[in-house]
Amino acid sequence: SQTEPDKGDPMLVRTLAACAALFFVCAPFAHAQTAQHPLDPLGWQEYWTVLEVLADAGHLDEGTEFSRVQLREPDKSGVWNWTPGSSITRSAFAVVRQGPQTYEAVIDISDSRLTSWTELTGAQPMWLEREFGSGASQVKEHPEFIAAMERRGITDLTFIDCIAIPPGYFGTVEQQGRRIGYVYCSDARGVRNTWTRSIGGLTVVVDMEDGTVLRVVDEGVIPVPETLAEYDRASLGQPREVQGPIHVSQPLGPGFTLDGHQVRWQNWSFHVRPDSRLGMVISTVRYRDGDRDRPVLYESSLSEIFVPYMDPSFAWHSRNFIDAGEFAAGGLTKPLLAGRDCPDHAVYFDHVVAGDDGRPGDRPNMICVFERVAGDVSWRHIGDPKASRPKRDLVVRMAAVLGNYDYLFDWVFNQNGSIRIGVGATGIAEVKTVIEADATTRPVGETRADAHGRFVAPHIVAVNHDHYFNFRIDLDVDGPRNDFLIDRLESVTLPEDNPRRSVWVVDETIARSESQAKMTIDYNRPAVWRVASESTTNQVGYRTSYQLMPGSNGN
């Protein structure tokens, strides 16, 4: 569903007037609303249908938990051929936990029946929301943990907060056949931001199925720093004044139209849906060319975020986070702040998310859509005549919050027919506490405290790490029959009588397998991927195609 900007927004009256005039839907959808498109997310009542069907089949009790409940997408060809007003068959897919057992279920929502119920073996589902906080009571009562805290001068555990996280899997005997959590603790006394108050060098290994403490690993006492890292307004004081406010307004309302989860802007049309694990999914992207809506892309979304930390200590070597696959409990995305995360004139999509018990809950402002004019130039040439075209984009944005990191993801639709995916990482760097105060206080003969990171505050080191963002992109350029090409720049030596000596040419190769399509970004061997239609050519005889152009790496 979509929601209007916050009622304190000075643009509200004008926006609502424009919405009424242009028949935009600006109010939240009712819980009972039925799907208007085959790829619409599950609605409130559909989640309840899932629960009722599982209960009727004898697969639901007080201990049943859900790692995932989502739309089970219909057949791709059926989606492309669907027309508004046609009937829609709805199904759901669920990952269900019952004690140590995990099951995959397919539920026919339209007919209220269970289609399949399959036990998974040798696999671990996503973590549940409750698991991150579970095990703390057993840990704080364990004698080895109490002794380790006493060695640090801490005898009152009242304000010690502990959290369990999934460690990287290394196939150790301890990990095999178990759902393991590593528990880390911090001193929350008198602070909001506890990232700088961690109990350094102390890790507790817990069996998440029954809460059993398997071992307590103490790598040495590190005093809890007194360094504060609060970021609330009261702690930071008066912010830097910014002269000359900039206002962007759309007195006639947005330049795009919404019909449920379908968006139309200039020549673009597409479907957007929130998704609890992936954040959002962009589907059925078409571009209007004259009197034809030409297919460009069937579906695209984030598929995974991999964040490995580069510290060999026990407390850190296992921090190889699979963010979307392990940490998306309760929904990968979190609400966007109107007027700050998105401009005042943005329109929002709400979402319904299943909790650990499978029951639906409302999540407002999960996706925003807005037009962006940043003063950039789309195209220009100064000749006769002088010509320039201002740039105007349509942005579809979500924000993921995973522990200390906040990620912003933009799908940007451009007027020139291109689509750009932008990723931004912000939030708080994950840090460890160290004995040394800074880079100048290294003990003689010992390993530097910042050997695997950088000091960011006294006794605080931000640990080196990577962020790998993986996206699933299913292009259907002028239809589903496409070739995956690699265009490589090859140097060609010219005859000796040519003063140029050499030029480069483009060598086009069709990749027939994933191994053939693999490519390392190497500026000494330039190449790009391209997806080309098998059946459609452009006005000069080339096959219509889209390039996949990776951005910068290693920043």
What do these predicted regions represent?
Residues 1-10:
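Short, Lys/Arg-enriched N-terminal segments with co-localized hydrophobic residues
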Residues 17-28:
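Bacterial N-terminal signal peptides
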Residues 30-34:
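Boundary at the C-terminal end of the N-terminal hydrophobic targeting segment
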Residues 61-110, 156-207, 266, 396:
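Exposed beta-strand-loop-beta-strand "reactive/processing" segments of non-cytosolic proteins
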Residues 112, 118-127, 152, 189-280, ...:
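Extended effector regions of multi-domain proteins
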Residues 9-17:
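Bacterial N-terminal signal peptides that target proteins for export
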Residues 38-80, 128-171:
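Short, non-transmembrane alpha-helical segments in secretory-pathway proteins
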